[in-house]
Every structure is written in structure tokens, then in C-alpha cells.
A protein has these predicted regions:
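Ubiquitin-like/PB1-type beta-grasp interaction modules and other compact soluble beta-rich domains
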Residues: 1-65
Length: 65
């Protein structure tokens, strides 16, 4: 199991890039924390999710007055 945004998922064996595409994330507006480290967007395709990994995906939103 991979823990993504606090939920256990059966996503081991796919890349971060593939996961983001499956879930329709816009990679221009997110940051991925992989096992407590922010990873560069260039690493998304080569970073393969493994059992025990912890991933947090943070989206940026504009706002203000």
C-alpha cells in the first residue's frame, strides 16, 4: 500500500507522473512531497511508488481580497 494524502491506495508500481495523470492533477499547480521530501517535477516520471511510501500532493490556489 502507498499512503497518498493520508489514504492508503493500491498504487505501488506506477510512477508519480502516471498517478497524477490518472487522477487528473494539473502538474503546473502542485507540489509533490515523496517520503517527506519535495521532489522536482522532472523526477515525477522516474519516481516509482512502492509499498510503504508516503505521498502528499499540495495544490496552490489563488485568492485574496
Amino acid at each position: 500500500m502507498v499512503r497518498i494524502n493520508g489514504q492508503d491506495c493500491e498504487k505501488a508500481g506506477i510512477s508519480v507522473s502516471d498517478y497524477l495523470e490518472q487522477e487528473n492533477y494539473n502538474v503546473k499547480h502542485i507540489v509533490v512531497e515523496y517520503n517527506l521530501e519535495i521532489i522536482p517535477k522532472e523526477w515525477y516520471a522516474q519516481t516509482i511508488l512502492k509499498d510503504g511510501d508516503e505521498v502528499e500532493i499540495v495544490s496552490f490556489m489563488g485568492g485574496g481580497c
